[in-house]
Structures are given as C-alpha cells and as structure tokens.
A protein has these predicted regions:
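Juxtamembrane "helix-exit" motif on the non-cytosolic side of transmembrane helices
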Residues: 33-41, 97-106, 154-162
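Lipid-exposed faces of alpha-helical membrane segments in multi-pass integral membrane proteins
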Residues: 19-26, 87, 91, 95, ...
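Alpha-helical transmembrane segments of polytopic membrane proteins
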Residues: 17, 51-64, 110-121, 165-176
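N-terminal topogenic module of multi-pass integral membrane proteins
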Residues: 1-81, 85-86
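Membrane-proximal helix-loop-helix units in multi-pass membrane proteins
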Residues: 90, 94-152
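Cytoplasmic juxtamembrane regions at transmembrane-helix boundaries
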Residues: 77-102, 158-162
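Terminal transmembrane helical module of multi-pass membrane proteins
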Residues: 141-188
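Membrane-water interface at the C-terminal end of transmembrane alpha helices
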Residues: 16, 124-138, 176-188
Length: 188
C-alpha cells in the first residue's frame, strides 16, 4: 500500500515537472515568434497583440524572474523548486534558440550563452527563493532581496529621479509581491 502511494507521488512529480518544461518550451517558441511578428493593425488578432504589447513583455527580464519565482515558491520542497525552475528554463532557452536557428536563419550564440548561464544557476537561485515563503528572519531577508531585484527591474532610479519603466513592469512587480506574500496552499 505504501509503495503504491510513493509511486503515485513520484508519477505526479514527473508529470508536474514535465508540464513545467512544456510550459517553458511553449513560452520560448511564443516569445521568439512574437519577436519576429510584424504587427499589421488591419488584422484583428495582430491589432490585439499590438495593444497588449506582448512582444515587449517577453523581452523583459522581470517576466522571466516572476515566472521562476512563482514556480519556486509554489514547489513542495526546495529541491523540487530547483528541478522545476531548471526544467522551465531549459525548455524556454532551448526552444527559443532552436526556433531562432530553424526559422529565423541565424544563431545568436553569444546572446544565448547568457541565458544558458542563467539556466545553469537557476536551480540554486530557485532553491534559495523557495525559503522566501517562510515567516522567519531568513525568509524576510530573501523576500527583501527578491523584491529589491524586481524593484530595480521595474523602476528607473537615480540620485535625482524615480520613474516607472512601464505599466507592465509595475504589474510584474505587484504580482511578485502577491506571489511572495500570499500563503501558497497549493504546491506543484
């Protein structure tokens, strides 16, 4: 009876991780497709894409950080957080890179090396981010560091000025606050 339960749990972990990987693949392809799409306002669905400005949203570092933070915080354990975030970024970066090579006719290797490097360190960062959902001092420090990074990603800050980069950046920042401070009941 206990071994059957463990098999079911392991099967669910594998399925969840595969779905996260697939989500990364889909977002990688969608992101590159949007990069190459020239918007024609006379076509209704392209007009909507132009209004939503999605091609710029997926060019922001903040959206990718938000997705990784969300996956990490909603994972059951820090180890699962690392595995899930690694699989997400593997799916996203490899599909983006392959789409660029196969359909765009060029290989942005130097640019992709930055993302591959980020992918390699993402499990460690996810492992640490998982602890942000706690109630102790360490969790508060981790949450503060995450929010600081997202704050810098969302706002222009200087000695004499403070300005919002865009409404999308503000929404990403607000969503990060929600993800970090709402108690996650359902985990992946």
């Amino acid at each position: 009876m206990k071994t059957d339960f463990k098999k079911i749990i392991m099967k669910n972990k594998i399925i969840n991780t595969f779905l996260i990987f697939l989500f990364g693949v889909i977002l990688g392809i969608f992101s590159k497709w949007l990069d190459n799409l020239s918007i024609d306002d006379s076509v209704w669905w392209q007009h909507i894409l132009g209004i939503l400005n999605l091609h710029n949203v997926f060019s922001l570092l903040g959206i990718w950080l938000l997705i990784a933070i969300t996956i990490s915080v909603f994972s059951k354990t820090p180890r699962r957080a690392g595995i899930n975030v690694l699989c997400f970024f593997l799916g996203m970066t490899v599909s983006y890179h392959l789409y660029t090579i196969l359909f765009c006719g060029f290989n942005p290797m130097r640019y992709m090396l930055i993302w591959y490097g980020f992918t390699l360190i993402s499990p460690l960062l996810a492992y640490v981010c998982w602890y942000a959902k706690g109630k102790n001092k360490v969790s508060m420090i981790i949450s503060s560091l995450i929010l600081s990074a997202m704050f810098l990603s969302s706002f222009y800050i200087g000695i004499w000025y403070f300005d919002l980069k865009s409404i999308i950046d503000l929404l990403i920042f607000i969503e990060t606050v929600i993800v970090l401070y709402v108690n996650p009941k359902n985990t992946i």
